[in-house]
């Protein structure tokens, strides 16, 4: 294989080729992000600790500690509602424009701008800890992060750079490697976060070391992308007339066209153009519905889970919280490893359903968790929970024209973003209302939504069956 068909790491490691690797940026950014997520939750928890003090009129029949804990949980939940609204809506103003500028002028624009927002938000948390600012200052930090594009602009830029300089045959390996780096970096940062969140001798602020490390990693990522990272030259793709594959975040997937038959074994019959386009539009619409319903379940569970583990019966400390967040990154790794295995023998729809069943079953068990080991069993059942959204996005790319990629994916991303904002608000309110009754209500709801999302995907799977097989099944049922 000549140099034109290889990825940067498979040929001679020249200085320029090493500088085209996006992995150092992904790793440092994700470590900073995992430290920030844990630090923000713990700092907010400590900030509301004093405000959740008991009342002199409060009944002595109930424990004062439980009352303070409930008030603290509600305060954190209300903070999360506003914070997620700001962080979720502000990128809508800039993410699309940054993507357009990156395509037109320079590929690093969206990455560098988004990482500037990451750095500013991390600095905001550091200043809040050092100067004991009110916790509301983090709303401004979230707004700055969002106006710089946030994760939407950043990850689209990472995927673009990861795909450049690599032939289509090796592109899936490159993108999987980026996913692996992301998962391992997040796991490492989360594992360390609880240990870093402690008082420094001579300083009363908790979380100073944790937030300082987050700022340092974010600053390294920004300066590396500005002064070291180079945009690789694009490699020409080889045309494979009998193979219809598209690279996604988790590898290369097979076609999902319901009207496409085996090109090698089945002779092509003329089809009515309008019928084929109509069928594809129906499949894309069903995939949209499945993605949105599943995203409702996933986003709601993640938002509530952080509060759930801080309250009885688990009542985790800082170190345990870091370990619990790290388990989420293990799920990220197992999900794309699952895609690597499943894509060899299953259709896209089958992989999506496997992921939805995995998440729904784990969420249902999570609702009845009483001990820490039960929490990790539930998370282990969710090991394929990240497969559905990525596979849906990859499957949709096979059903639309290249010229429509941007429009369709922007619409999908906007739908998922708005869904996440609405879901966060609704789930946090439900959590507050059911805090004293059944704390696992949100997880039961997520499980139901996850199983409900299988319905539109099942319809897509039915449409995927060749017409000849559907006719044979109908004849067998008549006989």
From Swiss-Prot:
Activity regulation remarks: Down-regulated by the anti-inflammatory drug methotrexate.
Intracellular or extracellular location(s): Endosome membrane; Cell membrane
Location of region: Disordered: 255-277
Membrane topology label: Multi-pass membrane protein
Posttranslational mods: Glycosylated.
Tissue: Expressed on cortical epithelial cells in the thymus. Mainly expressed in the thymic cortex and is highly enriched in SCID thymus. Also expressed in lymph nodes, heart, fetal liver, brain, spleen, intestine and kidney, but not in adult liver, skin, skeletal muscle and lung. Expressed in skin epidermis.
Pfam families linked: MFS_1
The entry's keywords: Cell membrane, Endosome, Glycoprotein, Membrane, Transmembrane, Transmembrane helix, Transport
One term of GO molecular function: cyclic-GMP-AMP transmembrane transporter activity
Positions bearing carbohydrate: 57, 61
Keyword Nucleotide-binding tagged: no
Disulfide pairings: none
Record PANTHER family: THYMIC STROMAL COTRANSPORTER HOMOLOG, ZGC:174356
Name of the protein: Solute carrier family 46 member 2
């Amino acid at each position: 294989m000549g140099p034109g068909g290889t990825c940067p790491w498979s040929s001679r490691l020249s200085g320029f080729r090493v500088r085209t690797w996006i992995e150092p940026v992904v790793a440092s950014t994700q470590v900073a992000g995992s430290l920030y997520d844990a630090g923000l939750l713990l700092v907010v928890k400590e900030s509301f600790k004093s405000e959740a003090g008991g009342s002199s009129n409060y009944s002595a029949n109930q424990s004062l500690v439980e009352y303070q804990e409930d008030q603290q949980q509600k305060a954190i939940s209300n903070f999360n509602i506003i914070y997620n609204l700001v962080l979720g809506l502000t990128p809508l103003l800039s993410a699309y424009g940054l993507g357009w500028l990156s395509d037109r002028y320079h590929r690093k624009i969206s990455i560098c701008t988004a990482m500037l927002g990451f750095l500013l938000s991390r600095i905001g948390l550091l200043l809040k800890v050092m100067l004991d600012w009110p916790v509301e200052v983090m709303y401004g930090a979230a707004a700055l992060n969002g106006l710089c594009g946030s994760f939407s602009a950043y990850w689209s830029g990472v995927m673009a750079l990861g795909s450049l300089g690599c032939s289509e045959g090796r592109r899936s390996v490159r993108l999987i490697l980026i996913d692996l780096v992301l998962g391992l970096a997040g796991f490492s940062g989360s594992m360390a976060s609880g240990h870093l969140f402690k008082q420094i001798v001579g300083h009363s602020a908790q979380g100073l070391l944790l937030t300082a490390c987050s700022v340092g990693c974010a600053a390294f990522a920004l300066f590396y992308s500005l002064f070291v990272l180079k945009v690789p030259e694009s490699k020409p793709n080889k045309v494979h007339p009998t193979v219809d594959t598209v690279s996604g975040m988790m590898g290369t997937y097979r076609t999902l066209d319901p009207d496409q038959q085996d090109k090698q074994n089945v002779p092509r019959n003329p089809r009515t153009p309008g019928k084929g386009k109509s069928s594809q539009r129906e499949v894309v619409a069903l995939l949209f519905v499945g993605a949105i319903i599943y995203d409702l379940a996933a986003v709601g569970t993640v938002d509530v889970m952080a509060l759930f583990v801080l309250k009885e019966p688990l009542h985790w400390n800082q170190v345990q919280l870091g370990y619990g967040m790290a388990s989420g990154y293990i799920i990220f790794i197992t999900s794309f490893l699952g895609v690597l295995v499943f894509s060899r023998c299953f259709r896209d729809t089958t992989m999506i359903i496997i992921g939805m069943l995995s998440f729904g079953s784990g969420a249902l068990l999570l609702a009845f968790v009483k001990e820490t080991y039960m929490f990790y069993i539930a998370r282990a059942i969710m090991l394929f929970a990240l497969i559905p959204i990525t596979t849906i996005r990859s499957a949709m790319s096979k059903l639309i024209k290249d010229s429509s990629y941007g429009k369709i994916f922007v619409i999908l991303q906007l739908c998922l973003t708005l869904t996440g904002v609405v879901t966060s608000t609704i789930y946090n309110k439900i959590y507050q209302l059911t805090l004293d009754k059944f704390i696992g209500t949100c997880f039961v709801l997520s499980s139901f939504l996850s199983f409900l999302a299988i319905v539109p995907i099942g319809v897509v799977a039915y449409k995927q069956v060749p017409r000849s097989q559907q006719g044979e099944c109908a004849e067998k049922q008549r006989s």
